[in-house]
């Protein structure tokens, strides 16, 4: 699948993948701080942003999407970063194609299995009747009973597009809803990436715990875990400067 991406900057290639319900736009503020040091590739994963929709949606096909992008751009090896779902994609890519990853950064996700925990968000998104929707404000009001956190609603509504025909989701909501269990799947047992790896966690997030370290080291023996103070799961939005600082320090 030919993914949508935005390329900018000069220097060694750095490819960044967003998380579930997100898009490459989520990384613009980080990208501004990095364009003088790296050739950046901000990527929309399948069924997200402006990339194509598909009924097939799992880490196996998302890894191959990424490989196809690197092949098309003539990139033999890259710095690779992914957040949340994107973190799972880049971990799977690194253990499958280790020779193509110079250094790996994983944003607030561990290699383990995560139980489904987006049911209420999906319930709210699926409850919106886009054919009757008059405004983004109305969409926000209708989502509020399901998702009380304004910041999360604003993040989700970035994926609500509008054209002459009305509102439409950029995400492939039916497929994501049907296959949501794919997002939480663990890395396969015995898979290893021995290259330099940085796990960046949010200090206020529960996605990476102390007891994940053993599993992280088993798959990524050359890994470091850094916890960003005053950051939750969306650490790049909450503490962008701290994230940039740690990325620069690690990548060089």
What positions do the PLM features span?
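Alpha/beta-hydrolase fold catalytic core
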Residues: 1-15, 35-38, 75-76, 178-181, ...
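Conserved alpha/beta-hydrolase catalytic His-Asp/Glu region
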Residues: 116, 131-187
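Catalytic active-site module of serine/aspartate enzymes centered on a nucleophile-bearing elbow/loop
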Residues: 223-252
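Conserved acidic catalytic loop of the alpha/beta-hydrolase fold
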Residues: 61-78
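Conserved serine/cysteine hydrolase catalytic core
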Residues: 165-219, 227
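Conserved HGGG/HGGXW glycine-rich cap/lid loop of the alpha/beta-hydrolase fold
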Residues: 4-52
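Flexible "cap/lid" loop of the alpha/beta hydrolase fold
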Residues: 92-96, 102-133
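Gly/Ala-rich beta-loop-alpha elbow adjacent to hydrolase catalytic centers
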Residues: 82, 86, 90
């Amino acid at each position: 699948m030919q993914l949508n991406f935005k390329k900018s900057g000069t220097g060694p290639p750095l490819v960044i993948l967003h998380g579930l319900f997100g898009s490459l736009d989520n990384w613009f503020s980080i990208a501004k701080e990095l364009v003088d040091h790296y050739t950046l590739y901000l990527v929309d994963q399948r069924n997200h942003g402006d990339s194509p929709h598909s009924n097939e949606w799992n880490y196996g096909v998302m890894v191959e999407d990424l490989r196809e992008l690197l092949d098309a751009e003539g990139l033999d090896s890259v710095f690779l970063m992914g957040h949340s779902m994107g973190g799972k994609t880049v971990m799977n890519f690194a253990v499958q194609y280790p020779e193509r990853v110079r250094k790996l950064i994983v944003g607030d996700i561990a290699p383990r299995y995560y139980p489904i925990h987006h049911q209420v968000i999906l319930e709210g998104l699926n409850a919106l009747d886009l054919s009757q929707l008059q405004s983004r404000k109305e969409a926000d009001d209708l989502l509020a009973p399901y998702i009380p956190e304004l910041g999360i609603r604003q993040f989700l509504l970035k994926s609500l597009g509008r054209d002459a025909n009305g509102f439409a989701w950029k995400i492939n909501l039916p497929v994501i809803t049907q296959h949501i269990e794919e997002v939480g799947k663990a890395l396969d047992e015995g898979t290893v990436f021995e290259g330099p790896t940085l796990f960046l966690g949010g200090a206020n997030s529960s996605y990476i715990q102390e007891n994940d370290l053993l599993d992280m080291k088993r798959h990524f023996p050359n890994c470091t875990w850094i916890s960003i103070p005053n950051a939750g799961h969306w650490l790049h939005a909450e503490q962008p400067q701290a994230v940039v600082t740690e990325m620069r320090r690690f990548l060089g």
